[in-house]
């Protein structure tokens, strides 16, 4: 909401400039756990989802810190490979999706660990498997559809379809929208 966004702006600016070390960590709320494991009792569903998060976060590894160092090196190698290729566009194809996304001139691939202003390496998102770059604002063509529901600020949205022409959204549709509990 607007008030929350305004109040959080100073912190968000410090975070995006890496003035401070920060991290976002997933934790299983009851509604999320029951959606993932509907046949389990509430406590069991939360425990099962917590275990999945621990596994994806490398917490269960014998040496989680070493595991993250190895993972960060892998992400760095992927970023470097993508930057060397200097792709002009990415073409996404899949169920309900045929989307070409042009990449910005002089784009750079990023992701994985970051160095904060204090010299400490941090992983902003745990778990994370992503590398990312900047799209060209005017070179997005085609359509993309969701294959899973989207949870946006406490609302589940299903069957999303978005059509792009010359970088602009020209059509949006969805078939289901409902509020859900986030606890």
Predicted segments, located by residue:
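Active-site bordering "gate/hinge" segments
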Residues: 1-141, 183
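Tryptophan-anchored aromatic micro-motifs
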Residues: 144-145, 173
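Short, basic/aromatic recognition patches
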Residues: 148
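Metallocofactor- and cofactor-centric catalytic cores in central/energy metabolism, strongly enriched
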Residues: 152, 157-159
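Short, acidic, Ser/Thr-enriched surface-loop or helix-capping motifs
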Residues: 164
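Conserved small/polar residues in nucleotide/adenosyl-binding loops
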Residues: 175-182
């Amino acid at each position: 909401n607007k008030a929350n966004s305004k109040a959080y702006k100073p912190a968000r600016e410090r975070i995006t400039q890496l003035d401070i070390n920060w991290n976002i960590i997933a934790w299983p709320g009851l509604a999320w756990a029951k959606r993932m494991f509907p046949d389990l009792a509430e406590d069991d569903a939360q425990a099962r989802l917590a275990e999945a998060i621990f596994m994806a976060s490398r917490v269960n590894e014998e040496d989680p810190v070493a595991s993250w160092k190895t993972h960060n090196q892998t992400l760095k190698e992927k970023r470097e490979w993508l930057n060397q290729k200097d792709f002009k566009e990415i073409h996404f194809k899949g169920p309900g999706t045929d989307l070409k996304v042009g990449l910005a001139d002089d784009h750079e691939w990023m992701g994985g660990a970051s160095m904060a202003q204090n010299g400490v390496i941090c992983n902003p998102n745990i778990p994370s498997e992503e590398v990312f770059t900047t799209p060209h604002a005017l070179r997005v063509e085609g359509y993309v559809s969701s294959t899973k529901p989207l949870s946006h600020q406490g609302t589940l949205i299903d069957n999303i379809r978005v059509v792009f022409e010359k970088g602009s959204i020209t059509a949006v549709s969805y078939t289901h929208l409902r509020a859900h509990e986030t606890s």
